[in-house]
């Protein structure tokens, strides 16, 4: 999961 990518987190900004």
Curated annotation (Swiss-Prot):
Its EC number is 1.2.5.3. Its cofactor is [2Fe-2S] cluster. It catalyses: CO + a quinone + H2O = a quinol + CO2. It is an enzyme of class 1 (oxidoreductase). It comes from the Bacteria. Keywords: 2Fe-2S, Iron, Iron-sulfur, Metal-binding, Oxidoreductase. One of its GO terms (molecular function) is 2 iron, 2 sulfur cluster binding. Binds 2 [2Fe-2S] clusters. Catalyzes the oxidation of carbon monoxide to carbon dioxide. Heterotrimer consisting of a large, a medium and a small subunit. This is Carbon monoxide dehydrogenase small chain.
């Amino acid at each position: 999961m990518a987190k900004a």
